Amino acid sequence: MQAKHLTFTVAAALAFGLGGTAADADVFTLKSATFEDGQIMPKKVANSGANTGNNPNCVGENVSPQFSWTNVPDGTKSFVMLMADPEGRGGAGVVHWVAYGIPASVTGFVEGEVAKPSDKYVGGRGTRGVGFYSGPCTPPGTMPHHYTFVLVATDFDPQELPPGLTRDEVTEKIAPGGKAPVHAKGAAGMVGLFVNPWKR
């Protein structure tokens, strides 16, 4: 995988204090039973088109992946989850999911759980304007897009941030003025690839 495709994940992980590798003991780690880090995600995670104006590039079922995390940093009160496609919209990027206020007691999401509003998180606002998981609509005939998932452990109380925040607004809350991430305790990330060889 080329390094340029990991820009958002790496930048977020470094900025929010991710260190080491998933193989290291006691490292904050994000995993999925739906796909392996750096591998192709299944068709079902792609958007169905229901929240995209019936975009013909949306060929899936909008089933959100399963996620779990371990070795949560000390002092964590809630988590932020961000999903983005840096290659979407011709390189302008697409933010697919912004979720925060995930209580520290939550250790993961089952498959399909966050493709709708849930009391396990506060919904932000992605590029498509929805506050829940909105899967890939990768154009056919392109190289695989790299969908980044970043989980940030924070010291925010679960209800501290209002609903409807964008990714940029959330990251500004975590690291005011683009300076030190004063509200982050650590971060973990994954990359899932998606390629569209299907027709609706």
Where are these regions (language model features)?
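Intrinsic disorder/low-complexity detector
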Residues: 7, 21-22
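Bacterial N-terminal signal peptides that target proteins for export
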Residues: 1-9
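N-terminus-centered regions that define maturation/targeting leaders and the start
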Residues: 22-200
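Bacterial N-terminal signal peptides
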Residues: 9-17
